[in-house]
Design a protein with these regions (language model features):
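Iron-associated oxidoreductase/ferritin-like identity signal
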Residues: 1-188
Length: 188
């Protein structure tokens, strides 16, 4: 197969854009930042989805912080430490989501108005150490399923957002395992 001098053969045999065409496309709509003409996802749907994920992470931060301060009992110290660590990690997730929203030309919705309605997970206070662990585990399981669905929706249409969501998903799975172990330890 012959290629023009400006075409770059890819490993799969597909041909990447010729350099002048690539340069021309990059100059179009430069105010869109990272979102180029090759962005294949429905940007408005992705922004809506990421704002729901942001709300979920923020609700999780608030729940974990409440549980950290309210946990008491003989087993409370290691559980509190886990709650505090998870709250910090969920805030990192929220920050990553907010940053990606801006990169996509959206606005991260940090408004407390409707936060619970936008969140996939619920804010449940819990009144015992056991119930707090269970509620956090349920919320992590909801987040895991939500992120899996988002990742599948994005497919190859937005690899950057998909990669970020896969990293957050891995963290949520670790949180769920941590909480399941804590729950087992308290029962044990």
């Amino acid at each position: 197969m012959k290629h023009s001098a400006n075409e770059i053969p890819a490993r799969s045999g597909a041909v990447l854009s010729d350099i002048p065409a690539l340069r021309k496309r990059a100059r179009q709509n430069i105010e869109e930042g990272a979102v180029t003409t090759g962005y294949a996802a429905d940007r408005e749907a992705v922004i809506r989805m990421l704002n729901e994920a942001l709300a979920t992470e923020l609700v999780c931060v608030l729940r974990y912080k409440r549980h950290y301060f309210m946990a008491k009992g003989i087993h409370a110290d290691p559980v509190k430490a886990e709650f505090l660590a998870h709250a910090g990690e969920e805030m990192v997730h929220a920050d990553r989501l907010a940053k990606r929203l801006v990169e996509l030309g959206g606005e991260p919705n940090f408004s407390p108005d409707g936060l619970s309605a936008r969140s996939h997970a619920e804010y449940v206070e819990g009144d015992t150490l056991n119930s707090m662990i269970k509620e956090n585990l349920i919320a992590e399981r909801i987040a895991i399923e939500s992120y899996r669905e988002m990742i599948a929706y994005l497919a190859e249409h937005d690899p950057t957002t998909q990669r970020m969501l896969k990293e957050i998903l891995a963290s949520e799975e670790e949180h769920a395992e941590d909480l399941a172990s804590l729950l087992e330890g308290i029962k044990g």
